[in-house]
């Protein structure tokens, strides 16, 4: 659910804050997040998404789901390494100030679809509120 809402939250927030740059989502995945993020951002105006995954670290079905995702703004990169290496690479891109300057000059800026993005976490709060309310209504103890 959160990854279907995130693209629209980002685009709306960018518009309200007069952000003119196109948002480039960088995400590392070990499987399911990649497909969900690609599907959520597919053909969303003002965005591009690049998903990095370990070639030998996802199931064949997960890989096929990612590499066959439709969308003119979706890109998938299989790396030789594990998830931690993919995640480290993404973090390095985020912290590279020279790369950020080059991206800005070209009209782009980075963001993420991983859980470091508060826009991904906030919609998930609904799950916890619902579960609590249901337990309370059923008079079950909350752990």
Which ranges hold each PLM region?
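PLP-dependent amino-acid enzyme catalytic core
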Residues: 1-143
